[in-house]
A protein has these predicted regions:
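Intrinsically disordered, low-complexity sequence elements enriched in Ser/Thr/Gly/Pro
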Residues: 1, 42, 90, 164-165, ...
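Start-transfer (signal-anchor) and selected internal transmembrane alpha helices
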Residues: 1-20
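Membrane-interface starts of transmembrane alpha-helices
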Residues: 2-5, 86-94, 116-124, 167
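Membrane-embedded helix bundles of polyisoprenyl
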Residues: 10-13, 103-113, 118-193
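Membrane-interface coil-to-helix junctions
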Residues: 14-106, 126-148
Length: 193
């Protein structure tokens, strides 16, 4: 139980900071989120609810390739449980969960690999997960999702007590998850940041 308190604290901080978005009927309603990502998320959810592989969508942009566009998020496993929700609510849930994922990864990396104190690791985690570098991508949800994996990438790459092959496998898994969340350019920025 004692090991869970940092995660509980991180959750409380994220909820407190993001409450105006997460706990109200407000939505992100400008730019790419409103005009691009909400329609994509709705089209993806419709296809997955119908158990249909969304190769093409005639409803968006006078027709567009869908599965071939990594920004659709079809192949990202953490998007699949969000299928029952409309796009604005699904995005809110994803933002909250990925902020927590970024917080937990930063905490694990700074506590386990950099040997910071619990307080130091918590401060580092809060600074990363709720700082400008990550939150600036909130309107580009796929890039936000990919960036949440960055601290886990650092953690996996240097995991003590594991063979080089195990570290490479874990690092590859984390990169694959980030790559399924966002197009290659965003994945590259996450892995080189």
């Amino acid at each position: 139980m004692r090991r869970l308190w940092p995660l509980a604290l991180g959750s409380a901080i994220i909820i407190a900071v993001l409450a105006p978005l997460l706990l109200t009927n407000l939505i992100l309603a400008r730019g790419d989120m409103f005009l691009y990502f909400y329609p994509y998320w709705d089209a993806r959810a419709d296809a997955l609810r119908e158990l249909r592989l969304p190769l093409w969508t005639p409803e968006l942009f006078m027709g567009a390739p869908f599965l071939a566009n990594p920004q659709s998020g079809v192949l990202y496993p953490l998007n699949w449980p969000l299928t029952p929700f409309d796009a604005p609510l699904a995005v809110k849930i994803s933002l909250g969960l990925h902020a927590l994922l970024a917080w937990a990864g930063t905490y694990a990396y700074t506590r386990g690999r950099l040997a910071l104190t619990s307080a130091g690791a918590g401060l580092a985690a809060t600074t990363f997960a709720l700082g400008g570098y990550v939150l600036a991508q909130a309107e580009h949800i796929n890039q936000f999702q990919a960036l949440a994996w960055l601290p886990w990438l650092l953690y996996a790459a240097g995991l003590p007590g594991r063979s080089a092959l195990q570290r490479a496998g874990l690092t590859g898994l984390v990169l694959a998850l980030a790559g399924c969340a966002a197009p290659p350019a965003a994945d590259t920025s996450a892995s080189t940041a």
